[in-house]
Design a protein with these regions (language model features):
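Catalytic center-proximal scaffold of phosphoryl-transfer enzymes
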Residues: 1-292
Length: 292
């Protein structure tokens, strides 16, 4: 979100972009299965969105229309802050504990692969199954294949079916056949640089890509709900002319927006019960205290 320096008069002073840390806590249906309920790769993951495949004349089934598509959301609440990742981890753990997540029958922690997300997992959510969002995994695999001038569908299918080690082996062989540029730091889009970068991403997240097991356990595979939540959050806090004070005011608007979006109706409850609200019944607590 865009921020400005407070207490400097009208207008925008020292404009800057601040990263918001966002998470959602979901209660979802759980339907474990003895066998993989969906072993075949959904067509929506087979090709990147910017490829010619999206121009196919024959409509393909949507991922949401496929059988065994995974758990459904029952109840959602969220959390957003301008704090650093360490403080955010404690805030998220407190929110999860308040909602009873640490006693849930099944527990999953899904994110996009950023290192600080896994640090939060290790510190606060070690009992949760760590899952790399499959959409991000597929995106990185497609980028690696594109750098080689190939279609990434086969590699993405291997990842979907739990054969990540095979993909890593083949990528390593391809990388060894390429000649690195004289200065990799300058030519970051060189095929060798792209493949080296994507290979490192997948190696770092390999242990969190056992997707067949997650499907059998009835766990979700993607962080799509948080992407949707962030878009709804940004409808209020982002805009070409929106600047928030870089202090508690900017933090407050994030809390208010999350309270409005959550299924627990936290904002509505606060407005209905806040001190001085005009529609509540007057309290006789003061009179009772005086009488005592």
């Amino acid at each position: 979100m865009q921020t400005r320096k407070p207490e400097h008069g009208p207008g925008v002073h020292d404009a800057a972009w601040r990263e918001t840390k966002t998470a959602i806590l979901l209660r979802m249906t759980l339907q474990p299965s003895a066998t993989d309920p969906h072993p075949d790769l959904p067509i929506c993951f087979a090709h990147p969105l910017d490829s010619d495949s999206e121009k196919l004349t024959t409509p393909e089934p949507n991922c949401l229309e496929l059988p065994g598509r995974g758990p459904e959301i029952i109840y959602r609440t969220g959390l957003a802050t301008l704090s650093n990742s360490e403080e955010f981890g404690y805030q998220l753990a407190a929110a999860a504990d308040n909602r009873g997540f640490f006693t849930a029958q099944a527990q999953a922690y899904i994110c996009d692969g950023q290192s600080y997300n896994w640090t939060i997992h290790r510190r606060h959510f070690a009992s949760f199954v760590p899952i790399l969002d499959f959409v991000h995994a597929a995106e990185h695999v497609h980028q690696a294949a594109h750098a080689l001038g190939e279609d990434g569908e086969r590699w993405v299918t291997c990842c979907w079916q739990g054969q990540v080690s095979q993909v890593l082996t083949e990528m390593t062989e391809c990388l060894n056949r390429l000649t690195p540029p004289p200065d990799p730091s300058v030519e970051q889009e060189h095929p060798w640089c792209v493949l080296h970068r994507e290979l490192g991403y997948l190696k770092n997240n390999q242990e969190r890509m056992d997707y067949p097991r997650y499907r059998c356990e009835g766990l979700p595979l993607t962080s799509s709900p948080i992407e949707s939540w962030v878009k709804q959050l940004n409808q209020r806090v982002k805009g070409s002319e929106k600047f928030w004070n870089d202090d508690e005011n900017g933090e407050s608007i994030l809390h208010l927006r999350n309270a409005w979006l959550g299924d627990d109706e936290a904002l509505q409850k606060h407005l209905a019960n806040r001190p001085g609200q005009p529609y509540g019944r007057p309290s006789n607590r003061t009179q009772s205290c005086k009488a005592a």
